[in-house]
A protein has these predicted regions:
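ABC ATPase NBD coupling module
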Residues: 48-51, 102-119, 152
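Conserved signature/switch motifs of ABC ATPase nucleotide-binding domains
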Residues: 115, 174-177, 194-195
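Short coil-to-helix segment of the ABC ATPase nucleotide-binding domain corresponding to the Q-loop/switch region
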Residues: 132-141
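Catalytic Walker B motif of ABC-type/P-loop ATPase nucleotide-binding domains
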Residues: 200-203
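Conserved ABC ATPase "signature" region
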Residues: 100-101, 140, 147, 152-171
Length: 323
Protein backbone atom coordinates (compact mmCIF):
# COMPACT_ATOMS: atom_id res chain seq x y z
CA UNK A 1 0.00 0.00 0.00
CA UNK A 2 3.01 2.26 -0.41
CA UNK A 3 2.61 5.45 -2.35
CA UNK A 4 3.69 5.09 -5.97
CA UNK A 5 6.29 7.54 -7.21
CA UNK A 6 8.32 7.84 -10.38
CA UNK A 7 11.97 8.55 -9.78
CA UNK A 8 12.63 12.24 -10.34
CA UNK A 9 9.02 13.11 -11.18
CA UNK A 10 6.90 14.79 -8.51
CA UNK A 11 3.18 14.20 -8.51
CA UNK A 12 1.62 17.32 -10.04
CA UNK A 13 -1.27 19.22 -8.49
CA UNK A 14 -3.54 18.48 -11.45
CA UNK A 15 -2.91 14.74 -11.08
CA UNK A 16 -3.55 14.90 -7.33
CA UNK A 17 -6.85 16.67 -7.97
CA UNK A 18 -7.88 13.95 -10.45
CA UNK A 19 -6.98 11.24 -7.95
CA UNK A 20 -8.95 13.00 -5.22
CA UNK A 21 -12.02 13.27 -7.46
CA UNK A 22 -12.10 9.61 -8.45
CA UNK A 23 -10.81 8.16 -5.17
CA UNK A 24 -13.63 9.26 -2.87
CA UNK A 25 -16.88 7.47 -2.22
CA UNK A 26 -20.20 9.30 -2.52
CA UNK A 27 -20.02 10.40 1.12
CA UNK A 28 -16.62 12.02 0.59
CA UNK A 29 -14.56 9.45 2.48
CA UNK A 30 -11.93 7.31 0.79
CA UNK A 31 -12.16 3.55 0.74
CA UNK A 32 -8.85 2.64 2.38
CA UNK A 33 -7.38 3.32 5.80
CA UNK A 34 -4.25 5.44 5.74
CA UNK A 35 -3.51 5.50 9.50
CA UNK A 36 -4.01 2.44 11.70
CA UNK A 37 -3.02 2.53 15.39
CA UNK A 38 -3.72 -0.61 17.40
CA UNK A 39 -3.27 -0.58 21.20
CA UNK A 40 -0.47 1.96 20.86
CA UNK A 41 1.70 2.48 23.94
CA UNK A 42 4.44 5.04 24.60
CA UNK A 43 6.32 5.04 27.89
CA UNK A 44 8.81 7.73 28.89
CA UNK A 45 11.22 7.56 31.81
CA UNK A 46 11.98 10.75 33.72
CA UNK A 47 14.09 10.80 36.89
CA UNK A 48 13.64 7.06 37.21
CA UNK A 49 9.85 7.30 37.01
CA UNK A 50 7.93 5.76 34.12
CA UNK A 51 5.21 7.90 32.53
CA UNK A 52 2.76 6.25 30.15
CA UNK A 53 1.86 8.93 27.60
CA UNK A 54 -0.18 6.56 25.42
CA UNK A 55 -2.04 3.72 27.11
CA UNK A 56 -3.34 1.41 24.41
CA UNK A 57 -4.60 4.02 21.94
CA UNK A 58 -6.66 2.86 18.94
CA UNK A 59 -7.17 5.09 15.91
CA UNK A 60 -8.17 4.59 12.29
CA UNK A 61 -8.10 7.42 9.75
CA UNK A 62 -9.20 6.83 6.19
CA UNK A 63 -7.51 8.28 3.13
CA UNK A 64 -8.78 11.74 2.33
CA UNK A 65 -10.12 12.54 5.81
CA UNK A 66 -9.79 15.93 7.49
CA UNK A 67 -9.70 15.14 11.20
CA UNK A 68 -9.10 17.16 14.36
CA UNK A 69 -7.49 15.70 17.49
CA UNK A 70 -8.41 17.41 20.76
CA UNK A 71 -7.63 16.82 24.42
CA UNK A 72 -6.25 18.43 27.55
CA UNK A 73 -2.54 19.10 28.01
CA UNK A 74 -0.78 15.85 28.79
CA UNK A 75 -3.49 13.69 27.21
CA UNK A 76 -1.09 12.25 24.62
CA UNK A 77 -1.95 14.33 21.53
CA UNK A 78 1.58 15.53 20.79
CA UNK A 79 3.06 12.11 21.53
CA UNK A 80 0.72 10.57 18.97
CA UNK A 81 1.59 13.22 16.40
CA UNK A 82 5.34 12.70 16.91
CA UNK A 83 4.93 8.96 16.36
CA UNK A 84 2.88 9.49 13.19
CA UNK A 85 5.51 11.97 11.97
CA UNK A 86 8.28 9.41 12.39
CA UNK A 87 9.94 11.55 15.06
CA UNK A 88 9.34 9.04 17.87
CA UNK A 89 8.87 5.27 18.20
CA UNK A 90 6.10 3.46 20.10
CA UNK A 91 6.99 1.34 23.12
CA UNK A 92 4.38 -1.29 22.21
CA UNK A 93 1.39 -1.84 19.98
CA UNK A 94 1.15 -1.34 16.24
CA UNK A 95 1.06 1.74 14.01
CA UNK A 96 1.10 1.92 10.22
CA UNK A 97 0.78 4.86 7.85
CA UNK A 98 0.46 4.29 4.10
CA UNK A 99 1.88 0.79 4.53
CA UNK A 100 4.91 1.90 6.56
CA UNK A 101 5.29 0.08 9.88
CA UNK A 102 6.24 2.83 12.33
CA UNK A 103 7.36 0.30 14.96
CA UNK A 104 9.81 -1.81 12.95
CA UNK A 105 11.05 0.39 10.09
CA UNK A 106 14.81 0.97 10.00
CA UNK A 107 16.61 4.31 9.73
CA UNK A 108 16.62 4.32 5.91
CA UNK A 109 12.89 3.59 5.73
CA UNK A 110 12.20 6.21 8.40
CA UNK A 111 14.08 8.84 6.39
CA UNK A 112 12.18 7.92 3.25
CA UNK A 113 8.92 8.00 5.18
CA UNK A 114 9.57 11.49 6.55
CA UNK A 115 10.59 12.80 3.13
CA UNK A 116 7.88 11.24 0.98
CA UNK A 117 4.87 10.14 3.03
CA UNK A 118 4.30 12.76 5.73
CA UNK A 119 4.49 16.55 5.92
CA UNK A 120 4.53 18.42 9.25
CA UNK A 121 3.40 21.92 10.18
CA UNK A 122 4.51 23.18 13.60
CA UNK A 123 2.78 25.84 15.68
CA UNK A 124 5.93 27.97 15.79
CA UNK A 125 6.63 29.50 12.37
CA UNK A 126 10.38 29.53 13.11
CA UNK A 127 10.37 25.71 13.05
CA UNK A 128 8.67 25.57 9.65
CA UNK A 129 10.68 28.03 7.55
CA UNK A 130 14.37 28.87 7.28
CA UNK A 131 14.59 32.61 7.99
CA UNK A 132 17.22 33.40 5.35
CA UNK A 133 15.33 31.75 2.47
CA UNK A 134 12.38 33.14 0.54
CA UNK A 135 9.04 31.34 0.56
CA UNK A 136 9.84 29.85 -2.85
CA UNK A 137 13.27 28.67 -1.72
CA UNK A 138 11.79 27.10 1.42
CA UNK A 139 9.27 25.15 -0.66
CA UNK A 140 11.91 24.05 -3.17
CA UNK A 141 14.31 22.80 -0.49
CA UNK A 142 12.50 19.52 0.36
CA UNK A 143 12.33 18.70 -3.36
CA UNK A 144 16.08 19.15 -3.65
CA UNK A 145 16.73 17.07 -0.54
CA UNK A 146 14.34 14.34 -1.63
CA UNK A 147 16.89 12.68 -3.89
CA UNK A 148 14.84 12.86 -7.08
CA UNK A 149 16.23 14.52 -10.17
CA UNK A 150 13.54 17.11 -10.70
CA UNK A 151 14.28 19.53 -13.54
CA UNK A 152 14.74 23.06 -12.25
CA UNK A 153 11.94 24.42 -14.43
CA UNK A 154 9.46 21.78 -13.20
CA UNK A 155 10.51 22.43 -9.62
CA UNK A 156 9.91 26.15 -10.04
CA UNK A 157 6.48 25.46 -11.57
CA UNK A 158 5.48 23.25 -8.66
CA UNK A 159 6.64 25.85 -6.13
CA UNK A 160 4.51 28.49 -7.84
CA UNK A 161 1.50 26.13 -8.02
CA UNK A 162 1.66 25.35 -4.30
CA UNK A 163 2.05 28.96 -3.19
CA UNK A 164 -0.81 30.05 -5.45
CA UNK A 165 -3.03 27.20 -4.23
CA UNK A 166 -2.56 28.37 -0.64
CA UNK A 167 -3.11 32.04 -1.42
CA UNK A 168 0.48 33.19 -0.81
CA UNK A 169 1.76 33.48 -4.36
CA UNK A 170 2.54 37.12 -3.61
CA UNK A 171 5.05 35.94 -0.98
CA UNK A 172 7.12 34.05 -3.57
CA UNK A 173 10.22 36.22 -3.11
CA UNK A 174 9.70 37.25 0.52
CA UNK A 175 11.68 35.98 3.49
CA UNK A 176 9.62 34.98 6.57
CA UNK A 177 10.16 38.25 8.46
CA UNK A 178 8.40 40.07 5.61
CA UNK A 179 5.30 37.89 5.90
CA UNK A 180 2.41 38.01 8.34
CA UNK A 181 1.88 35.14 10.76
CA UNK A 182 -0.88 33.67 8.64
CA UNK A 183 1.20 33.95 5.47
CA UNK A 184 4.09 32.16 7.17
CA UNK A 185 1.85 29.28 8.22
CA UNK A 186 0.36 28.95 4.74
CA UNK A 187 3.86 28.98 3.26
CA UNK A 188 4.74 26.27 5.80
CA UNK A 189 1.86 24.16 4.50
CA UNK A 190 3.31 24.56 1.00
CA UNK A 191 6.67 23.32 2.33
CA UNK A 192 4.95 20.32 3.90
CA UNK A 193 3.31 19.55 0.53
CA UNK A 194 6.50 19.90 -1.51
CA UNK A 195 7.03 16.16 -2.06
CA UNK A 196 3.32 15.33 -2.42
CA UNK A 197 2.90 13.46 0.89
CA UNK A 198 -0.09 11.26 1.63
CA UNK A 199 -0.50 12.83 5.08
CA UNK A 200 -0.20 16.33 6.53
CA UNK A 201 0.16 16.62 10.31
CA UNK A 202 -0.48 20.05 11.83
CA UNK A 203 0.32 20.70 15.50
CA UNK A 204 -1.71 23.70 16.71
CA UNK A 205 -1.22 25.50 13.35
CA UNK A 206 -3.47 28.41 14.40
CA UNK A 207 -2.30 28.67 18.01
CA UNK A 208 -0.29 31.88 17.57
CA UNK A 209 -2.64 33.62 15.12
CA UNK A 210 -5.54 36.04 15.41
CA UNK A 211 -8.99 34.82 14.39
CA UNK A 212 -8.81 36.10 10.81
CA UNK A 213 -5.38 34.60 10.10
CA UNK A 214 -6.44 31.37 11.82
CA UNK A 215 -9.44 31.11 9.51
CA UNK A 216 -7.20 31.62 6.46
CA UNK A 217 -4.83 28.86 7.61
CA UNK A 218 -7.67 26.44 8.28
CA UNK A 219 -9.19 27.27 4.88
CA UNK A 220 -5.81 26.47 3.33
CA UNK A 221 -5.74 23.06 5.05
CA UNK A 222 -9.29 22.37 3.91
CA UNK A 223 -8.32 23.33 0.34
CA UNK A 224 -5.40 20.89 0.45
CA UNK A 225 -7.73 18.16 1.66
CA UNK A 226 -10.53 18.82 -0.83
CA UNK A 227 -8.50 19.73 -3.92
CA UNK A 228 -5.58 17.33 -3.59
CA UNK A 229 -7.14 14.53 -1.56
CA UNK A 230 -4.37 14.79 1.03
CA UNK A 231 -5.25 13.36 4.43
CA UNK A 232 -4.97 16.08 7.10
CA UNK A 233 -4.71 15.50 10.85
CA UNK A 234 -4.85 18.62 13.04
CA UNK A 235 -4.07 18.77 16.75
CA UNK A 236 -5.84 21.84 18.09
CA UNK A 237 -7.24 23.66 21.10
CA UNK A 238 -9.10 26.03 18.76
CA UNK A 239 -12.81 25.26 19.15
CA UNK A 240 -13.64 26.94 15.84
CA UNK A 241 -11.27 24.58 14.02
CA UNK A 242 -12.37 21.47 15.91
CA UNK A 243 -16.04 22.21 15.18
CA UNK A 244 -15.47 22.91 11.48
CA UNK A 245 -14.18 19.46 10.50
CA UNK A 246 -16.29 16.42 9.79
CA UNK A 247 -14.62 14.30 12.48
CA UNK A 248 -13.17 15.33 15.84
CA UNK A 249 -11.40 12.71 17.96
CA UNK A 250 -10.85 13.35 21.67
CA UNK A 251 -7.93 11.81 23.56
CA UNK A 252 -8.02 11.41 27.33
CA UNK A 253 -5.45 9.68 29.54
CA UNK A 254 -3.54 8.33 26.56
CA UNK A 255 -6.55 6.74 24.82
CA UNK A 256 -9.12 7.82 22.28
CA UNK A 257 -12.17 8.51 24.42
CA UNK A 258 -14.84 9.94 22.11
CA UNK A 259 -15.56 11.20 18.62
CA UNK A 260 -17.87 13.81 17.16
CA UNK A 261 -19.08 13.19 13.61
CA UNK A 262 -20.74 15.98 11.65
CA UNK A 263 -22.93 15.84 8.57
CA UNK A 264 -25.01 18.27 6.55
CA UNK A 265 -28.80 17.97 6.76
CA UNK A 266 -31.90 20.01 5.97
CA UNK A 267 -34.00 21.48 8.76
CA UNK A 268 -37.80 21.83 8.76
CA UNK A 269 -37.48 25.04 6.69
CA UNK A 270 -35.34 23.40 4.02
CA UNK A 271 -32.18 25.20 5.15
CA UNK A 272 -28.91 23.31 5.36
CA UNK A 273 -27.61 22.79 8.89
CA UNK A 274 -24.72 20.84 10.39
CA UNK A 275 -25.76 17.98 12.65
CA UNK A 276 -23.18 16.80 15.19
CA UNK A 277 -23.36 13.46 16.97
CA UNK A 278 -21.01 12.44 19.79
CA UNK A 279 -19.86 8.85 20.21
CA UNK A 280 -17.74 7.19 22.87
CA UNK A 281 -14.95 4.88 21.75
CA UNK A 282 -15.18 1.19 22.63
CA UNK A 283 -11.78 -0.55 22.62
CA UNK A 284 -11.02 -4.21 21.90
CA UNK A 285 -11.58 -5.12 25.54
CA UNK A 286 -15.04 -3.55 25.47
CA UNK A 287 -13.99 -0.58 27.62
CA UNK A 288 -15.34 2.91 27.07
CA UNK A 289 -14.78 6.27 28.73
CA UNK A 290 -17.77 8.34 29.73
CA UNK A 291 -17.45 11.96 28.62
CA UNK A 292 -15.97 13.90 31.54
CA UNK A 293 -18.92 16.30 31.65
CA UNK A 294 -21.40 13.44 31.94
CA UNK A 295 -19.58 11.80 34.84
CA UNK A 296 -19.17 15.10 36.69
CA UNK A 297 -22.79 16.15 36.26
CA UNK A 298 -24.10 12.84 37.62
CA UNK A 299 -21.35 12.52 40.26
CA UNK A 300 -20.28 9.14 38.88
CA UNK A 301 -17.07 8.02 40.59
CA UNK A 302 -15.26 4.72 41.13
CA UNK A 303 -18.12 2.55 39.85
CA UNK A 304 -21.52 2.78 38.15
CA UNK A 305 -24.55 0.56 37.66
CA UNK A 306 -25.21 -0.65 34.13
CA UNK A 307 -28.22 -2.42 32.69
CA UNK A 308 -28.78 -3.99 29.30
CA UNK A 309 -31.94 -2.88 27.50
CA UNK A 310 -33.28 -4.33 24.22
CA UNK A 311 -31.49 -1.72 22.10
CA UNK A 312 -29.22 0.22 24.47
CA UNK A 313 -27.28 0.20 27.73
CA UNK A 314 -28.13 2.43 30.69
CA UNK A 315 -25.52 3.78 33.10
CA UNK A 316 -26.52 4.97 36.58
CA UNK A 317 -24.75 6.49 39.53
CA UNK A 318 -24.03 3.99 42.31
CA UNK A 319 -26.43 5.07 45.07
CA UNK A 320 -25.80 2.08 47.32
CA UNK A 321 -23.29 4.06 49.37
CA UNK A 322 -25.96 6.62 50.18
CA UNK A 323 -28.32 3.98 51.56
Amino acid sequence: MRRERREGTPVGLAELERRAARGRDDDGRDRNALIVCDRLVRIFTADGVEVQALQGLDLLVERGELTAIVGASGSGKSTLLNILAGLDTPSAGAATVAGFDLVTMDAAARLRYRREVVGFVWQQAARNLLPYLTAAQNVALPMRLGGGRIPRRRRAERVRELLDLLGVGHCHDRVPERMSGGERQRAAIAVALANAPALILADEPTGELDSRAAEEVFTALRTVNERLGTTVLIVTHDASVASAVRRTVAIRDGRTSSEVLRRAALDEHGDEVVVAQEYVTVDRAGRLQLPAGFAERLSIRDRARVALQPDHITVHRDDSRDA
